């Protein structure tokens, strides 16, 4: 963002949380049931939640925003590390 900003190019990132898409099929059914409880809003987001964040950043409303990560997770990050499907082995502390 700092390198491209002088050229009028904005660089941002969207970081979605638990979003109800076909990607959920990668998780076991018992894990997907827990996704509704992993954030303060007590629901999963949907593709429109993410799309509206992208529109916000790309529209005139985001014209002075660069170098940012827009987290669209219903507040999940506020709760710390959440593993609704269980902690993967490579993240476990022994």
Regions found by a protein language model. Name each.
Residues 2-6, 63:
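Alpha-helical segment proximal to the catalytic Tyr-Lys
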Residues 6, 15-26, 72:
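Short, flexible catalytic-loop segment of classical short-chain dehydrogenase/reductase
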Residues 13, 29, 34-65, 74:
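C-terminal helical subdomain
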Residues 23, 41, 76-78:
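Methionine-biased hydrophobic packing positions in alpha-helices, especially
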Residues 23-29, 83-88:
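Conserved mid-core segment of classical short-chain dehydrogenase/reductases
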Residues 66-94:
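Short C-terminal tail/terminal secondary-structure segment
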């Amino acid at each position: 963002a700092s390198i491209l900003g002088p050229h009028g190019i904005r660089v941002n990132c969207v970081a979605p949380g638990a979003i109800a898409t076909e990607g959920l099929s990668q998780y076991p059914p018992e894990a997907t049931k827990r996704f509704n409880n992993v954030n303060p809003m007590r629901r999963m987001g949907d593709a429109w939640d993410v799309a509206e964040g992208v529109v916000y950043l790309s529209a005139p409303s985001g014209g002075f925003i660069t170098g940012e990560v827009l987290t669209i997770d219903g507040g999940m990050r506020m709760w710390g590390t959440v593993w609704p499907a269980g902690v993967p082995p490579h993240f476990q502390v022994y």
